Structure formats: structure tokens, C-alpha cells
Swiss-Prot record:
Recorded superkingdom: Bacteria
One GO BP: response to hydroperoxide
Similarity section: Belongs to the UPF0246 family.
A GO term from the CC aspect: cytosol
Protein name: UPF0246 protein Lreu_0493
UniProt cross-references to NCBIfam families, sorted A to Z: PRK02101.1-4
InterPro entries from the UniProt entry: YaaA
Species this protein is from: Limosilactobacillus reuteri (strain DSM 20016) (Lactobacillus reuteri)
Stretch forming the signal peptide: none
Cysteine disulfide partners in this protein: none
Pfam families: H2O2_YaaD
Length: 249
């Protein structure tokens, strides 16, 4: 079983808490992206980053010029510090939990492609949905093409998606009939329908990863037992492609 999650905008450098094990699988492609980004002016990069203040854009522009993809690396699982990762709390995982996520969890990334938890990375700013026509490609979805799909499904695993639509779109266009891809929905029931709110969903996704790791879950039935934070599985609203979890207040 493989679990996919999105990265986070907020990141840190932490070379002390955990040691990285490998370099990312698609490091050459990352170097290509970095080279393209360095060829852009500040104004051009600011447009790529979109909804980003001038102060933050300048900070990232200056950082970009000195980025070294092979020095001062942080394991991806603790490099990202957004809400999902805070609720995941990988720093308190047991050894078994850390081994579980290394084997089963994959982080999708516009900059790195696909990451194992202990791949060594550095802070960057580039979302999969950002307007980045790298080296003549239309956007990052076009740049990565089928590569991330093939890496994810190379062992024909069941894939549980805890990723946002922005990152799922790097995988779903390439799914074949035999592929098993199941999306998890976390929300509240409003007028008979489950409505998902971004902040609560990020918290639930982090809790789900922690639950899966702590309990060494390898089956769909195990995933359905998730009940952290007041959620319960709704069999009646779920399908073969979607597991729905309702927040019960």
C-alpha cells in the first residue's frame, strides 16, 4: 500500500533531529527546474509564485541564487512544517512508525516530483499548480508527465490519496483500469452532503498518516477504522474510489 500526501508551503532546515537517508529519485529533473528558475528575473519569478508578497518573493529570489541541492539537507518528513505535518507529528513516531512511512508514504512535490520521507531536501517555493512553463513545457504537470505515476505504481500497489486535488492531478490522468486509487474525504455533513473544509482536512490528513503509521495499517479495512479527532467512517457515502469520513461534533 502507498499513501500520497501534498507538501506544505512552510518549510524548515533541521539537520539534527533525524538524518536523511537518500537523495530524491528525480534530482536531475529538480536541477533542471532550478536552472530554469535561476534564468528568470525577479519580476518573472514573482508571477510564477502568484499569491506571494513582494517581501516574501524577494526573500525566495535571493535564496534561489544560493540553493545547493546536496548540502544541509533535511528529511522531507520534517522539512515541511504546515498544518498537516504538525498533526502528523513525525518527530514522536516510534522506530516502527518511521519505517512504515519510509516504506509506504510518498510526498508529491512540484519541485522534487515524488519524495520518500527520508529523502534529503532543502526549502523551496514552487507549487505543482504554479504557472511554471519549465524549459518549454506548458506547466509542471506537463513537465513531470507520466513519471510520477509510473514511480508510484511501479509495484502495482494500492494507493490511498490524502493529497489535495492540485497534487492528485499529477497522477490521476494516467490511471489505468487495473490501478487501485482511493481518495479519502474528511468533512461535515451539511444538508445530506459531506462538505470538506481545507483547514480541517489538513488536520485530519495528518492525523490519518499518524494513525496508519502507529497501527502499521496495510489494508482498506484498516484505513476505515480511523476515528481520531471525532471522525467516523461513512460506509453509505463511500465508494470503491472514495472513503468518506464524517466529523461528528
Amino acid at each position: 500500500m502507498k499513501i500520497i500526501i501534498s507538501p506544505a508551503r512552510t518549510m524548515q532546515v533541521d539537520t539534527d533531529s533525524l538524518l536523511y537517508k537518500d537523495l530524491p529519485e528525480f534530482l536531475q529533473q529538480t536541477k533542471d527546474i532550478l536552472g530554469w528558475m535561476r534564468s528568470l528575473s525577479y519580476d518573472e519569478l514573482h508571477k510564477v509564485w502568484g499569491n506571494c508578497s513582494s517581501r516574501l518573493a524577494m526573500k525566495n529570489y535571493q535564496w534561489l541564487q544560493q540553493m545547493d541541492l546536496q548540502r544541509k539537507l533535511t528529511p522531507a518528513i520534517i522539512a515541511f512544517t504546515g498544518l498537516q505535518y504538525q498533526y502528523m507529528a513525525p518527530s514522536v513516531f516510534s522506530e516502527d512508525g518511521l519505517k512504515y512511512v519510509q516504506d509506504n508514504l510518498r510526498i508529491l512535490s512540484g519541485f522534487y516530483g515524488i519524495l520518500r520521507p527520508f529523502d534529503g531536501i532543502i526549502p523551496y517555493r514552487l507549487g505543482m499548480g504554479d504557472m511554471a512553463p519549465v524549459n518549454g513545457y506548458k506547466n509542471l504537470y506537463d513537465f513531470w508527465g507520466e513519471q510520477l505515476y509510473h514511480e508510484l505504481y511501479k509495484n502495482n500497489d494500492l494507493v490511498i490519496s490524502l493529497a489535495s486535488v492540485e497534487y492528485e492531478k499529477a497522477i490521476t490522468p494516467y490511471l489505468q483500469t487495473q490501478d487501485r486509487f482511493i481518495k479519502c474525504i474528511f468533512g461535515e455533513e451539511i444538508n445530506g452532503k459531506i462538505k470538506q473544509k481545507a483547514t480541517l482536512a489538513k488536520m485530519a490528513r495528518g492525523n490519518m498518516v499518524r494513525y496508519l503509521a502507529e497501527n502499521q495499517i496495510q489494508t482498506i479495512e484498516g484505513v476505515k477504522q480511523f476515528n481520531i479527532g471525532g471522525y467516523r467512517f461513512r460506509e453509505d457515502l463511500s465508494t470503491d474510489e472514495k472513503l468518506v469520513f464524517e466529523l461528528v461534533k
